[in-house]
A protein has these predicted regions:
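Short, basic-rich loop-to-helix N-cap that marks the start of a DNA-contacting helix
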Residues: 43-54
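Residues within the helices of the helix-turn-helix
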Residues: 12, 23, 53, 64
Length: 80
């Protein structure tokens, strides 16, 4: 699995846990829809740390909380 896919899955899972829509997150952090769509899409070719940090803050989480998930512990995680 690629890192960008892992980040997108983690964001999706957190949104579901928080009963929050992607649209609501976009509005809360003033992120353009196309930016979020690219990050969450299958054609995402990489993740931008600034964008990920913006999302983490919008989810009211720490960086440690966000990355503390088994999905990021996969030794075969591809850095894209």
């Amino acid at each position: 699995m690629k890192l960008s896919t892992a980040v997108a899955l983690r964001v999706s899972n957190i949104l579901r846990e928080k009963n929050m829509s992607q649209y609501r997150l976009e509005k809360d952090i003033a992120m353009p829809h196309n930016t979020m769509k690219t990050l969450m899409g299958e054609r995402n070719k990489g993740v931008n740390l600034k964008t990920v940090m913006q999302i983490i803050r919008g989810l009211n989480m720490t960086t440690s909380e966000f990355f503390n998930d088994p999905i990021f512990e996969n030794p075969d995680l591809e850095i894209d």
